Amino acid sequence: MLGRALINKYGFLIHPRRFVHLNDKSLDGTFILPSKKNHMYDVPTNDPSGILNASDIDRINNLPFFDNTSPTKETNTKEGALLSEKLASVKELFGEDPENPSFINYRFPRGLENPYFDIQVNQLKKKRLSVTQLCTTQNWCELRNFYDFYSQNLSNQLLNLKFQVQKGKKIHKSLEDETHPELNQYKSFTHNFLALTKLSMDIDNDMDALLDNWFNSINRLVSLFTKGDGHAREIVCHGFINLEDGKLVEHLLNSDSKTKENVIISGVIDHLTLRNRHNHQVQKGAAHLDTEYQSWGNILTNLLSNLKELKSNNEIVISDIKTRSVPKIPSIESVIESSKLQTMYYKFFFSHLSQDMTQTYHSFLINAQRRGLDVDAPINPTKILTFILTNPLFANDVKNLLYGLPINHSAFDNDAKGSNTFDMTAFNDLLDRGPTSFNVPIEQDEDSSESTKCVSLRDYGHFYTKWKTPLTLKYFAARLSQIYFIVGNLVSNDLMIEYYYHNDNFHNIIFPYDPLKLGTHAHDSAMVWFGGRDMHPIEPTQKNFNTYCKFCDYRHVCSWKNKNELKLIDLGKELKKIILESSMK
């Protein structure tokens, strides 16, 4: 039934024993001339004259009609070229299906370890997975998803060319900018400040990215309780999953050397909402704290001491934001279920990070170390200076490090002293050359339209010296452990998916946290990532092929689809024969 396909030089894929495919594409990326409809033409198999051989195909190739045809438009586009390259890459790695030559195998390549080591560790040099990677294994077709994972660079380039993907990113960014305008203001200030002072910010990209994520998360979560409007967006979180048994890790040891079998799962929460526990109204400035002359440390101490009261009246809802090309929620249940699970992971992570501040402190340090970062290395002084100038709460807080005072975090205070030094003495030179006054962004009050204020470098001269306690990632991990402990204790069991069409939030789904469902999903996803099972293609029904395969990049070269569609055709013929025979009796 599955005889070897013959492909003519123009891409027609011909199965001599069965039928001719039109509007198809070969595995090497050759595109086939489109017809108005994708017909299948039966070739009578009981008539030898009806079977096309190599000579017949050669005659077809030389018909004048084919000499005047031009390649399809898709092959001339950047998207078409990337797609051809991706298909060739996946074919080379997975190989052809030995039972169905010319089509890609639907089993993991032999000789490779498992997707986690093949893709994350060896290919991307990342010793971690993401929540998205766990949730997208089963949200659509697991086969397609892992073809994409193994060709991640090309797949991402193709995704970035798609209009809807770009539109979705813009919506997420506009929501973040609306809630946290200080981020763009900080970037603009830093660009101008470095240019005017002729300073450079020589900092490792991975360190810079992590530092920004940690700094922004602390600042946004603190603002959630102070001057914020009851919302925080783009908050990092993480947890661990066991490499051996695929279970989410609930309790961590404090040393990374004892947790090597646990893989980090990282995520970014789209939206947190602080609301009244009883009437569900959004809470603005729930802690009723005046932030003037305050510091991160003072605010965190206040929140921790009043946590019981905060918890009795308030809760925090975790939301995931999904953008749509039409104002309708997905019709496929597995897609909605995947979004629900994604939000459940975030809930679990915050619960994990709110059990014990010392454990959470070490958890963040392990996260940084797994990224190859030195948690004891002093952070770039210029980076810290920009934080000091633009964030008074941070500036007031790090005075403790400047003077060698404790920050009221036992794990950090016992761990902070080291041989490294943190020296900002060089910034004294700025006072003798160039401008010393700058407009910096400020957090706006509702009754104020001012978005900047003028500061002088001379006002911060006390920082331009050698600090008694070096400023390292450990300081940020300590403050993160405190604010995550507070937020985690307030996280609601109600979770939410927000659907956006353009900038309109047209529908929300609220659902309960289900730890049993989450545990089952985590284990099943871990098994495929860590090599405990093979990929699960979609159930081979015609409805599924029509639904899942319609826009799939691999639809023309997928052996699973091809083989099972042939079986469905044969089954249809058998049923037709049975019906005819029954009607003749």
UniProtKB/Swiss-Prot annotation:
Binds 1 [4Fe-4S] cluster. The keyword Magnesium applies. GO terms for biological process: interstrand cross-link repair; mitochondrial genome maintenance. Its EC number is 3.1.-.-. Residues 1-26 form a transit peptide. One of its GO terms (molecular function) is 4 iron, 4 sulfur cluster binding. [4Fe-4S] cluster binds at C141, C549, C552, C558. Optimum pH is 7.8. Mg(2+) binds at D270, D320. Its cofactor is Mg(2+); [4Fe-4S] cluster. Its main location: mitochondrion. The keyword Hydrolase applies. One of its GO terms (cellular component) is mitochondrion. It is found in: Mitochondrion. Single strand DNA specific 5' exonuclease involved in mitochondrial DNA replication and recombination. Releases dinucleotides as main products of catalysis. Has the capacity to slide across 5'double-stranded DNA or 5'RNA sequences and resumes cutting two nucleotides downstream of the double-stranded-to-single-stranded junction or RNA-to-DNA junction, respectively. This is Exonuclease V, mitochondrial. The lineage of its organism: Eukaryota, Fungi, Dikarya, Ascomycota, Saccharomycotina. The gene is EXO5.
